[in-house]
């Protein structure tokens, strides 16, 4: 399932610098780094940030990765500081989806791409209940569409995309 998301993400020109919101323990971070991108990995979990700094220390030393403790709703970047903003399988954890999407738009010059799990993925790709994922997906899609995002829905995941230029 995550392989499908990774393949889908490869089709996007993310530019050179990417803020990754909800980086967790770095699965997507590593893929972005392997694409030759500079990544600012954001998470609210101090353990995840510590892990990223340690596990990817060579990228940190090379200036290709910054791992920053911050909420999705308040990103510590200037307007348009990164080319793109990406989030994979984190949106269902974010309390204020509207604020998070607006923040990703604010810091990205070109593109915002957000992936998350559908209710059908419950128990298959993640430990969440179908009810929980359905509720969060409905909220996220309604907010995103009101903000001008495009929705693509697959069986186990969905994508919200907004191009800025």
Where are these regions (language model features)?
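Conserved alpha-helix/loop element of class I SAM-dependent methyltransferases that forms part
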Residues: 1-15
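Class I SAM-dependent methyltransferase core
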Residues: 20
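Class I SAM-dependent methyltransferase SAM/SAH-binding core
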Residues: 25-74
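A conserved beta-strand element that flanks and buttresses the S-adenosyl-L-methionine
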Residues: 86
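Short catalytic micro-motifs in class I SAM-dependent methyltransferases
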Residues: 89-90
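A short, conserved alpha-helix within the catalytic core of class I
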Residues: 94-103
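Conserved beta-strand signature within the Rossmann-like core of class I S-adenosyl-L-methionine
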Residues: 109-118
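Conserved Class I S-adenosyl-L-methionine
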Residues: 125-144
């Amino acid at each position: 399932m995550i392989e499908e998301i990774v393949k889908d993400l490869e089709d996007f020109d993310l530019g050179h610098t990417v803020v990754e919101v909800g980086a967790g323990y770095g699965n997507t971070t590593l893929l972005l780094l392997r694409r030759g991108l500079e990544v600012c990995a954001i998470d609210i979990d101090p353990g995840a940030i510590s892990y990223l700094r340690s596990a990817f220390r060579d990228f940190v030393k090379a200036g290709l990765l910054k791992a920053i403790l911050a909420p999705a709703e308040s990103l510590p970047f200037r307007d348009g500081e990164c080319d793109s903003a990406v989030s994979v399988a984190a949106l269902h954890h974010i309390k204020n989806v509207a604020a998070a999407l607006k923040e990703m738009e604010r810091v990205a010059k070109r593109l915002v791409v957000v992936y998350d799990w559908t209710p059908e993925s419950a128990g298959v790709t993640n430990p969440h209940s179908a009810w929980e994922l359905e509720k969060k997906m409905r909220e996220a899609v309604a907010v995103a569409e009101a903000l001008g995002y495009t929705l693509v829905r697959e069986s186990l995941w969905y994508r919200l995309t907004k191009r800025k230029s």
